[in-house]
């Protein structure tokens, strides 16, 4: 019995191990995902092509995200065309800092283990400051929606020399580690729009 993995590779490894051992593999649904495999299969059945935009709209509508009744807020499904601006000659201006978190004891032990096992590998963990607890992940989410989300949309694809993060959320690791639920991240972003603190272009783009 295993929780449904989020990668085909891992699923294949599990199935191979079970087959080799003569054990039946029973998968439990991973509720972290917004759409189950069965639900996606029903949506995809009999479609000539699988495109992101129709699926995105279906998920928005079914979850009621940025919706006004049965229609998207403002009448537009996406703001991609508006969110490809550059910074101009003066550059991005002041970019809010991403919060950093002091490694806890478990993380410090893991860093030491990596240093011992892979001393010659590239990179360094000396400045590791990612959230590794639920509490820190929530702090990272709050910092993003309040400080960087409002300016995220229009220049989300823009780059500038020396700018490493810009206004991006840096929440993917916390989501992948399941320190954050995608539903609460979506709700937090939408709440900023509903409260008038972030524009629809930024919130929908995120």
Indicate where each model-derived feature is located.
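Catalytic cores of enzymes that engage adenine nucleotides and/or redox cofactors via long glycine-rich
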Residues: 83-206
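Beta-rich, aromatic/charged-enriched effector core domains that present basic-aromatic interfaces
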Residues: 2-129
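Functionally constrained cores in energy, signaling, and assembly domains
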Residues: 1-2, 148
């Amino acid at each position: 019995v295993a929780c449904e993995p989020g990668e085909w590779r891992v699923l294949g490894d599990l199935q191979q191990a079970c087959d080799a051992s003569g054990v039946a593999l029973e998968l439990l649904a991973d509720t972290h995902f917004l759409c189950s495999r069965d639900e996606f299969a029903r949506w995809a059945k009999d479609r000539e092509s699988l495109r992101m935009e129709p699926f995105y709209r279906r998920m928005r509508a079914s979850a009621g995200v940025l919706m006004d009744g049965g229609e998207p807020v403002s009448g537009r499904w996406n703001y991609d065309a508006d969110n490809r601006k550059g910074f101009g000659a003066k550059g991005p201006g002041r970019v809010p800092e991403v919060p950093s978190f002091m490694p806890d004891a478990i993380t410090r032990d893991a860093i030491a283990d990596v240093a011992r096992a892979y001393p010659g590998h590239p990179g360094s963990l000396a400045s590791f400051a990612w959230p590794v607890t639920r509490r820190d992940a929530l702090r990272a989410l709050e910092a993003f929606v309040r400080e960087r989300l409002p300016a995220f949309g229009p220049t989300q694809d823009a780059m500038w020399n020396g700018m490493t993060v810009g206004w991006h959320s840096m929440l993917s690791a916390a989501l992948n580690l399941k320190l954050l639920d995608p539903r609460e991240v979506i709700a937090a972003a939408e709440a900023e729009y509903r409260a008038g603190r972030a524009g629809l272009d930024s919130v929908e783009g995120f």
